[in-house]
UniProtKB/Swiss-Prot annotation:
The protein's name: N-succinylglutamate 5-semialdehyde dehydrogenase
Active site feature: E244, C278
Organism: Burkholderia ambifaria (strain ATCC BAA-244 / DSM 16087 / CCUG 44356 / LMG 19182 / AMMD)
Cited function: Catalyzes the NAD-dependent reduction of succinylglutamate semialdehyde into succinylglutamate.
Database matches in CDD domains: ALDH_SGSD_AstD
Enzyme Commission no: 1.2.1.71
Keywords noted in UniProt: Arginine metabolism, NAD, Oxidoreductase
Enzyme class, spelled out: oxidoreductase
Length: 487
């Protein structure tokens, strides 16, 4: 099989074989040989050779290729959505929205580059000051499995627009989506070597991250892996490292008038994409008293009716499987540890079949758990924390090393003003789900959630470096000389 895309050609990998599986059926979705260290070296060398020509290409010419990519995505929406659903378990209705977001991101990325990193001029008394932006060179892009099309392209598109060349290492759990996406780039007319694909598992990733000829590494994925990368590049200031990672995100519930609206937004926050969005709410803060009890009863009632099914089921389910049977088992195990520490299940999570990734959406009350672990459980496991005062809720919401997203559901505008001033997160929403974000706004967090704003408007900032010039069209001796100079 030809699994790798290097220097404009599909070639076979020379590393170990691996496969991806449909988490809802356990059927093999993709299989092939991974990229060895030698394959990775060839991919980086190809990107290095292509850099001079690609970066010298007119900005508009680069953008035309990227626009063709977006148009082809729209044409192939159903095929790519099917590939996403097959490998991730994500229902087709949601996979289709991912492909649409991939295409829409192109226009935003072009606008962002022009507005944030385009050329700017300022007249001076004896010339002009010019700010330009230059690409870094060869950048490695590491993609996650939860949005295997959308999130890698949130790095790749702005990197290419800026004039960089790319070596792309997708998640080993979604190699088929990566291949389908790169095929679209190839058809769009991307020159050989500008984008290279290396498939593989941990060893492939290590070979790419350790390569001495990359100029940047753009990563979306777990905080644990991102932290390792940050430590690895701690002594290499020449490497541009952009990290977008996870969160232990809080959603604070106020005593609102519309109970069902609050329940709906809570379910969307906690269980959309089977809880596999980095912005999903992990901790739900509920007021003590009668309202809190009514809210939890209604939340449990609606949640208990949520079904999970295969990605192409008819009718479509709200949730699909989580990414793998192993991931499902880890979620159930995390729940068990919390129960051992004193948590009380409201709806207990179970794994439908040990071979598959199906788990039910679960709600567990952790109010009485001392020293609650500050962990991101990447799935539909909602932890309930009851609070006595609004200030207590905010204090406990901020008690995390992460800082990606946070939300408040409340009718009181004064409560919102206080919340947005005191909460610590990069995405803070009011009366909207925590995982609602605009591609035209910064996307990212603070603390262990990352150090840049990839996959959105601000991605242009780390894809090129600023170059300042002071220029004059005519070389002349200045009228006033420095002391001690005689002509």
């Amino acid at each position: 099989m030809t699994e790798l895309f290097i220097d404009g050609a599909w070639i076979a990998g020379s590393g170990p074989a691996f496969a991806s599986r449909n988490p809802g059926t356990d059927a093999i979705a993709w299989q092939g040989d991974s990229a060895s260290a030698a394959d990775v070296d060839r991919a980086v060398a190809s990107a290095r050779r292509a850099f001079a020509g690609w970066s010298a290409l007119d900005f508009e010419a680069r953008c035309e290729i990227v626009k063709r990519f977006a148009a082809l995505l729209t044409e192939r929406k159903e095929a790519i959505a099917t590939a996403i659903g097959r490998e991730t378990g994500k229902p087709l209705w949601e996979a289709r929205t991912e492909v649409a977001a991939m295409a829409a991101k192109v226009g935003i990325s072009i606008q962002a580059y022009q507005e944030r990193t385009g050329e700017k001029r300022q007249d001076m008394a004896d010339g002009v000051a010019v700010l330009r932006h230059r690409p870094h060179g060869v950048v490695a892009v590491f993609g996650p499995y939860n949005f295997p099309g959308h999130l890698p392209n949130g790095h790749i598109v702005p990197a290419l627009i800026a004039g960089n060349t790319v070596v792309f290492k997708p998640s080993e759990l979604a190699p088929g989506v990566a291949r389908a996406t790169v095929e679209v780039w190839q058809e769009a007319g991307l020159p050989a070597g500008v984008l290279n694909l290396v498939q593989g598992e941990k060893d492939t990733g290590i070979a790419l991250a350790n390569h001495r000829q990359i100029d940047g590494l753009f990563f979306t994925g777990s905080s644990d892996t991102g932290t390792l990368l940050h430590r690895q590049f701690g002594g290499r200031p020449e490497i541009v490292l952009a990290l977008e990672m996870g969160g232990n995100n809080p959603l604070v519930i106020g005593e609102v008038e519309d109970l069902d609206a609050a329940v709906h937004h809570t379910i969307q926050s906690a269980f959309l994409s089977a809880g596999q969005r980095c912005t999903c709410a992990r901790r739900i803060f509920v007021p003590q008293g009668a309202f809190g009890e009514r809210f939890l009863a209604r939340l449990a009632d609606v949640t208990s009716k949520i079904t999970a099914d295969v990605f192409d089921a008819d009718p479509q389910p709200f949730m699909g499987a989580v990414i793998s049977a192993r991931a499902a088992a880890k979620l159930v195990d995390a729940q068990s540890r919390l129960i051992e520490q004193g948590a009380k299940p409201i709806i207990e999570m179970t794994q439908r079949d040990p071979r598959l990734g199906f788990v039910n959406a679960s709600i567990i009350d952790v109010t009485g758990v001392a020293n609650l672990p500050d962990e991101e459980h990447f799935g539909p496991l909602a932890q309930i924390v009851r609070y006595a005062t609004f200030d207590e809720a905010i204090e406990r919401a901020n008690d995390t090393a992460f800082g990606l997203s946070a939300g408040l559901l409340a009718d009181d505008a004064h409560a919102w003003e206080h919340f947005r001033r005191t909460i610590r997160a990069g995405i803070v929403n009011w009366n909207r789900p925590t995982n609602g974000a605009s591609s035209a706004a910064p996307f990212g967090g603070t603390g262990r959630s990352g150090n840049h704003r990839p996959s959105a408007y601000y991605a242009a900032d780390y894809c090129a470096y600023p170059m300042a010039s002071v220029e004059s069209t005519q070389l002349t001796l200045p009228a006033s000389l420095s002391p001690g100079l005689h002509f």
